[in-house]
Amino acid sequence: MPRSLKKGPFIDLHLLKKVEKAMESGEKKPIKTWSRRSMIIPDMIGLTIAVHNGRQHVPVFVTDEMVGQKLGEFAPTRTYRGHTSDKKTKKK
């Protein structure tokens, strides 16, 4: 179920402060965050945010199509390496 409109978007306060500071200074350095639950707001457009996926920080360049989605959607946590092949059937 989606979040109620009367509540507004959720964004962690420490991340919001980092975004505002980066917008004021005009820095292009990636902003590191562990907050996958924060929603992307229009102030973040054009910034690179390094989102933690449990192992490393994945750089995410924010565009206008991403507004309204969560940061964690762009940093996958699981790697799929494919199913192992059955060696018995390959020999035939």
Swiss-Prot record:
Record's keyword annotation contains RNA-binding: yes
GO molecular function terms attached to this record: rRNA binding; structural constituent of ribosome
Keywords of the record: Ribonucleoprotein, Ribosomal protein, RNA-binding, rRNA-binding
GO cellular component assignments: cytoplasm; small ribosomal subunit
Gene Ontology process terms (BP): ribosomal small subunit assembly; translation
Sequence similarity: Belongs to the universal ribosomal protein uS19 family.
Protein name, per record: Small ribosomal subunit protein uS19
Native source species: Psychromonas ingrahamii (strain DSM 17664 / CCUG 51855 / 37)
Phylogenetic classification of the source organism: Bacteria, Pseudomonadati, Pseudomonadota, Gammaproteobacteria, Alteromonadales
